[in-house]
Amino acid sequence: MYKLLKKSGKARRGEFTTPHGVIQTPVFMNVGTLAAIKGAVSSMDLKEIGCQVELSNTYHLHLRPGDEVVKKMGGLHKFMNWDRPILTDSGGFQVFSLSKIRKIQEEGVYFNSHIDGRKIFMGPEESMRIQSNLASTIAMAFDECVENPAPREYVEKSVERTTRWLHRCKDEMNRLNSLPDTINNKQMLFGINQGGTYEDIRIEHAKTIAKMDLDGYAIGGLAVGESHEDMYRIIDAVVPHLPEDKPIYLMGVGIPSNILEAVDRGVDFFDCVLPARNGRHAHVFTKEGKINLLNAKFELDDRPIDEGCQCPACKHYTRSYIRHLFKAKEMLAMRLCVLHNLYFYNNLMEEIRDAIDGNYFKEYKERKLKEWGGRA
């Protein structure tokens, strides 16, 4: 259940109550594709840096180790030793982005595994069953992610199919939640708005799925190559047509400036691989924007990554030392930078929540964008 606590302009401060705890929103979800953050970061680390929600990937976990294995181990929470909320995506994005050979039919999608090439089928019911086996807190509906740009006629047909799939997802989840051997029989379902960059298709789809009384609503199919202006235009078009008493999730968006702009438009949930991926390559976020620690100017820099930061890396190590670790190809380098970036993101969201609580979010946003100077 979502409770709106405060608004600052269109920015929303809320609480989302789940079977695994209350999520303070706006929130950034840390992406652990295979039930782990790439960069040697553990679930204990995530708690220490203030992570509220972990996101795992249905497609990848279905292939390895297999959702049946996870179910036999008691579900994702026990499997990865994490007692806070977990969101699993439906696998739809990976089916359409990773699989070179796929066939879309009304019942679902036939595709080839990106690991060994074997033929696999996934549809709404299969996605729900896999996510039920994983026993995540929040399951995402199975949808079709169209390429961007795509012909209008195809997008219209795709959105209609995604709506039919959403009804099937809801029916199947209700069935699964009623079974005696279901680990989490209070699993929640978020629907996904699609429609490419066509505002009218997006709006009509938002109105349609808003009537389904789901636990939350996501805006999908963005951050896939369109301009930031197009992204903001679609968010502006869609958000007013989604229920105000449900959380709104902007899928796959994680550039800090994009997060600020989306919060300013009423978005509550975010996720992205960016902080971990950048950290693994020595790109770290600071109050003054993103920097590359491999640059020669940091060789003798005795400052922490970001002065004033309370993450484990900044409290104990210098830029010079971490740069040396990267040059020496030590795994500790990746770990420290991933920890720092994840802390930066979770701290950013805490500052955003405080700014909305204090009704100064607009001023906060403008100050941060000026400080970053287009570098974040």
UniProtKB/Swiss-Prot annotation:
It catalyses: 7-aminomethyl-7-carbaguanine + guanosine(34) in tRNA = 7-aminomethyl-7-carbaguanosine(34) in tRNA + guanine. It comes from the Bacteria. It is an enzyme of class 2 (transferase). The active site is at D89, D271. Pfam families: TGT. Zn(2+) binds at C309, C311, C314, H340. GO terms for molecular function: metal ion binding; tRNA-guanosine(34) queuine transglycosylase activity. GO terms for biological process: queuosine biosynthetic process; tRNA wobble guanine modification; tRNA-guanine transglycosylation. Its EC number is 2.4.2.29. One of its GO terms (cellular component) is cytosol. Keywords: Glycosyltransferase, Metal-binding, Queuosine biosynthesis, Transferase, tRNA processing, Zinc. Residues 252-258, 276-280 are annotated as: RNA binding. Signal peptide: none annotated. Pathway: tRNA modification; tRNA-queuosine biosynthesis. Substrate binds at D89, S90, G91, G92, F93, D143, Q194, G221. NCBIfam families: Q_tRNA_tgt (TIGR00430), tgt_general (TIGR00449). Homodimer. Within each dimer, one monomer is responsible for RNA recognition and catalysis, while the other monomer binds to the replacement base PreQ1. Catalyzes the base-exchange of a guanine (G) residue with the queuine precursor 7-aminomethyl-7-deazaguanine (PreQ1) at position 34 (anticodon wobble position) in tRNAs with GU(N) anticodons (tRNA-Asp, -Asn, -His and -Tyr). Catalysis occurs through a double-displacement mechanism. The nucleophile active site attacks the C1' of nucleotide 34 to detach the guanine base from the RNA, forming a covalent enzyme-RNA intermediate. The proton acceptor active site deprotonates the incoming PreQ1, allowing a nucleophilic attack on the C1' of the ribose to form the product. Belongs to the queuine tRNA-ribosyltransferase family. This is Queuine tRNA-ribosyltransferase. It comes from Clostridium botulinum (strain Hall / ATCC 3502 / NCTC 13319 / Type A).
